[in-house]
Amino acid sequence: MVMANSNLFNSDYADMARALLDAGAEFMLVGGYAVSVHGYPRTTFDIDFWVRPSPENAQKVMGALRAFGAPLQEISEADFDHPDMVVQIGVAPRRIDLLTRIDGVEWEEAAPHAVTKDIDGLPVPVVGLGELIRNKRASGRPKDAADAAALEKIAEGRNA
């Protein structure tokens, strides 16, 4: 099911999401924007896209970055071919982070639970609520623990 959420992304974020979608890249929205989409709006100074680490997806992500107009001098396909990479484009409050791993959750277990949300007219895949809670709990940062607690209340309300 696609759920609408208008005017959430700035133009850079929307353009990057559109480029990933157009390239056919496998990705999910994670981080603070995913927290907001799942019902707990909060301030964040970047956007986090979790991309599947694989050779095939790496080619698609690089194509998306080229289409987006990202500076590619220090970025290669190999950066997206294995876990534990973070590629940052731009500076806060418009920074885009492309991650190949998130704490506490593996791609293969999260992908079937991703939900597609209509964000600014784009069908954006978002990490599932349960996986987002696990990710936030695993990170160990105080703000992520607060996010997890708020998301758990939202999950309880949905299950009531």
Stretch-by-stretch model annotation:
Residues 1-160:
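Compositionally biased terminal segments of proteins
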